[in-house]
C-alpha cells in the first residue's frame, strides 16, 4: 500500500488514510464527494472530508 511504510507498519508522512470509500491517493476526499449512490432515492451518501469512511445519509439506517 503506497500510504503505509511496510517496514514500520505506520502511515507515511502526509498520508491521511490507506483505504476506504472516501480515501483517494492517501488523502480524504473532499466534503460532498459522492461515495455511495442511492438506489432508492436521490439522497446519495457523501464524504465528510474528515474521514475515509462513507457515512450513511441517515434516512434509511
From Swiss-Prot:
Q: Which Gene3D superfamilies match?
A: Disintegrin domain
Keyword Disulfide bond among record annotations: yes
GO MF assignments: toxin activity
Specify the Disintegrin domain's residue ranges: 1-61
Where's it mainly located?
secreted
Short motif (Cell attachment site): ranges: 39-41
| Keyword Glycosyltransferase among UniProt keywords | no
Compartment(s): Secreted
* SMART domains given in the database record: DISIN (SM00050)
Write out the entry's keywords from A to Z: Cell adhesion impairing toxin, Disulfide bond, Hemostasis impairing toxin, Platelet aggregation inhibiting toxin, Secreted, Toxin
Tissue localization of expression is: Expressed by the venom gland.
Source taxon at top rank? Eukaryota
GO cellular component terms given for this protein: extracellular region; plasma membrane
| Disulfide topology | 3-26, 17-23, 22-47, 35-54
Q: Which InterPro entries match?
A: Disintegrin_CS, Disintegrin_dom, Disintegrin_dom_sf
Q: Name one Pfam family in it.
A: Disintegrin
| Stated family | Belongs to the venom metalloproteinase (M12B) family. P-II subfamily. P-IIa sub-subfamily.
Q: Which PANTHER family match?
A: ADAM A DISINTEGRIN AND METALLOPROTEASE DOMAIN (PTHR11905), DISINTEGRIN AND METALLOPROTEINASE DOMAIN-CONTAINING PROTEIN 28 (PTHR11905:SF32)
Any further remark recorded for this protein: Negative results: does not induce chromatin fragmentation (apoptosis) in T24 and HeLa cells.
What binding partners and quaternary form does the record give?
Answer: Monomer.
Protein name, entry field? Disintegrin rubistatin
Species assigned in the record: Crotalus ruber ruber
Amino acid at each position: 500500500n503506497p500510504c503505509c511504510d511496510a517496514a514500520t507498519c505506520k502511515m507515511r508522512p502526509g498520508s491521511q488514510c490507506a483505504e476506504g470509500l472516501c480515501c483517494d491517493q492517501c488523502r480524504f476526499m473532499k466534503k460532498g464527494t459522492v461515495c455511495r449512490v442511492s438506489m432508492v432515492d436521490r439522497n446519495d451518501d457523501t464524504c465528510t472530508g474528515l474521514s475515509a469512511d462513507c457515512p450513511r445519509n441517515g434516512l434509511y439506517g
